[in-house]
Amino acid sequence: VTGAARHVDDGGNSSGDAGLADGLERLWTPHRMTYISGEDRPEGGYDKPAGCPFCLAPGLPAEQSLVVARGRHVFAVLNLYPYNPGHLLVCPYRHVADYTDLDAGETGELAVFTQTAMRVIRKVSNAHGFNLGMNQGGVAGAGIAAHLHQHVVPRWGGDANFMPVIGRTKVLPQLLTDTRDLFAEAWPA
C-alpha cells in the first residue's frame, strides 16, 4: 500500500505538525514489524553464539541459510531483511562485535569478500553503485550488534535515494533463494 502524507485542516484543533504534507510517498510494509519488534529474536537475544543467526548460518545448508560463499575467516550471506535486492552481509565466523577486535586474517578476508561481493552483484544485477558499511553497536543501528557484519547494499540510478536504506523499506523483485543461487554461481572459486 502506498500513499502520500496529506494535510488535514481540522480548524486549528491539532497539536503540532501531525498530518503536515512532506511530499514523500509511503510504502507500508507490515511484515517488517517482525524484525523491528524483535518477534523472531531468540529468547536470550543475539549476544551469545547459541542464539546468533550469524553463528548458526554457516552450519546450515547454503540454500536454507542463504550463504553465498565461504572463506577461511568470513562468509557472505544474503540479508534476510534486505534494504535493496541483492543486499549481502560479510560476516566473520568468530562471534565478535567490534571491528577493532578482528585479527589481521579476518580483516583482510572481510575486505576481499566485500570487493568480491561488489563484483558479483555488478555481474549478476548490473548495480550502478553501492552503500558499504558497518553499524557498530545498537545505538548506531545494528540489529545484531553482538556479531560484526559488513553491509554491501547495491544501488541503481532511480532507486529513490538513501531513504530505502534508512527507511528499511523496499519492494524486492526476486525471491532471496533465487538471488542466492545466482550469486553463488557467479562467486569465483
Task: Report residues per predicted region.
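HIT superfamily nucleotide-processing domains
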Residues: 1-189
